[in-house]
């Protein structure tokens, strides 16, 4: 039991630094939406090439998340984040200067690898550096940073497009191309700035004490824990817990995964990662403009709706960050997913008969925003917290990679299937299916996921055995 003071300024600092990786994740994922048409026009892309441009980063992400656990457990959490920052920097700058479509795709894939690595390592690192009382909100900083990255990308796209339309620049210089005639270069290249900042500030944070203990570097681990806890007794208590967790019989990670209790939690993690993608949130974020158009909102500004959705997403994530350690992970899922089901049923009903009944499309937009609110306050935040908490230290990196890979596979599948579902099942059937997929998610969390609020990682490891 920790009884003394905690240096929360220091803990918050290292958490914010790691969360910058989430900002890059969000920006890199969302910025593509503002560049599709201009890139397709400049390089004369056909439909297949256009789809490849949109999806190529996902290929890199799947590879990155596949190796992230091994990287994190072999070279450490800190150096893995440094690697991801380098990849983001190379990708952003390379995209800005690409002369051919092949070069552009190659650099997008490089950035995708960075996304995959950081999506596993950043929340894992924050979880291992946090204190039990505040771990939920600290890990939630990562999801908040993703939403800020989304919003930042939408706003950067809008600003550069407006700047391009003012036609203030003329000539053929590189600056003119980046911020004027070929503004997509500026949209993609702007990521270089936060990527370089991320790379530099990582050097001011320590390695995870749990990883250091795993590598038998106890003196270094003690120094890190000593900066978190001011009481010497608390330092010893924390180190004893970590030592007991990692000092048991040495096995390979894959052999450790064969244990029944560990295998069960890995399956649960995979299930909530995949199911979370089939509850519609990424379909709404990715295909929102076309869905809004089908609803009768085509006369409005699609970019405005995008920024509106991004704003609600970000502000709700801030609320979730403030309450997750008070309300608990499972209650947020119950309330949030319950609200998602209601919202999805209302959306399906609108597409089935709302237009016939003369219901205003603004009502649909309101329900969409309510749906985003329910997602952001529950599954979008809770999934990263749970995945960073629910595995033993010795397999945490590998297990998070498996769950993260499942999440990215789910993202890929929903991205590919959504257009087909919208055309085959119609919007009404598609959103009804999303509502149905919420049911097994909430049942899995209810029956198989323990409440981890206020528990140390070592205490969580005990109750999941």
Feature names for model-found ranges:
Residues 1-220, 224-226, 246-465:
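Alpha-helical transmembrane bundle of multi-pass membrane proteins
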Residues 232-244:
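Short, well-structured alpha-helical segments
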């Amino acid at each position: 039991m920790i009884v003394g003071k905690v240096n929360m300024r220091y803990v918050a600092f290292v958490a914010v630094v790691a969360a910058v990786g989430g900002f890059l994740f969000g920006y890199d994922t969302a910025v593509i939406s503002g560049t599709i048409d201009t890139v397709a026009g400049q390089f004369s892309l056909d439909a297949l090439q256009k789809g490849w441009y949109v999806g190529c980063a996902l290929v890199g992400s799947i590879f990155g998340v596949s190796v992230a656990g091994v990287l994190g457990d072999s070279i450490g959490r800190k150096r893995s984040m440094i690697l991801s920052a380098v990849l983001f920097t190379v990708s952003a700058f390379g995209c800005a200067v690409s002369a051919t479509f092949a070069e552009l795709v190659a650099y997008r894939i490089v950035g995708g690898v960075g996304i995959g690595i950081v999506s596993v390592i950043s929340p894992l690192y924050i979880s291992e550096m946090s204190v039990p009382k505040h771990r939920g909100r600290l890990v939630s900083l990562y999801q908040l940073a993703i939403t800020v990255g989304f919003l930042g990308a939408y706003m950067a796209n809008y600003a550069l497009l407006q700047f391009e339309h003012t036609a203030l620049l003329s000539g053929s210089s590189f600056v003119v191309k980046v911020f004027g005639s070929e503004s997509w270069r500026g949209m993609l290249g702007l990521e270089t700035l936060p990527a370089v900042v991320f790379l530099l500030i990582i050097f001011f944070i320590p390695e995870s004490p749990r990883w250091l203990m795993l590598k038998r570097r106890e003196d270094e681990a003690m120094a890190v824990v000593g900066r978190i806890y001011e009481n010497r007794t608390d330092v010893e208590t924390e180190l004893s817990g970590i030592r007991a967790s990692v000092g048991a019989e040495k096995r390979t990670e894959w052999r450790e995964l064969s244990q029944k209790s560990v295998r069960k939690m890995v399956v649960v993690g995979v299930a909530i990662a995949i199911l979370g993608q089939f509850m519609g949130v990424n379909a709404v974020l990715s295909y929102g403009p076309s869905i809004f158009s089908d609803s009768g909102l085509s006369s409005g500004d699609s970019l405005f709706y995008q920024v509106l959705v991004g704003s609600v997403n970000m502000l709700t994530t801030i609320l979730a960050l403030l309450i997750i350690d008070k309300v608990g992970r499972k209650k947020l899922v119950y309330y949030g997913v319950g609200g998602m089901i209601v919202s999805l049923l209302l959306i399906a009903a609108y597409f089935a008969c709302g237009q016939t009944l003369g219901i205003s499309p603004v009502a649909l937009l309101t329900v969409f925003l309510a749906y985003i609110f329910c997602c952001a306050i529950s599954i979008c935040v809770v999934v990263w917290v749970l995945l960073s908490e629910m595995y033993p230290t010795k397999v945490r990196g590998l297990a998070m990679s498996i769950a993260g890979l499942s999440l990215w596979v789910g993202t890929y599948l929903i991205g590919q299937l959504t257009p087909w579902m919208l055309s085959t099942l119609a919007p009404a059937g598609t959103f009804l299916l999303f509502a149905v997929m919420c049911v097994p998610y909430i049942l899995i969390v209810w029956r198989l996921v323990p409440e981890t609020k206020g528990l140390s990682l070592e205490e969580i490891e005990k109750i999941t055995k």
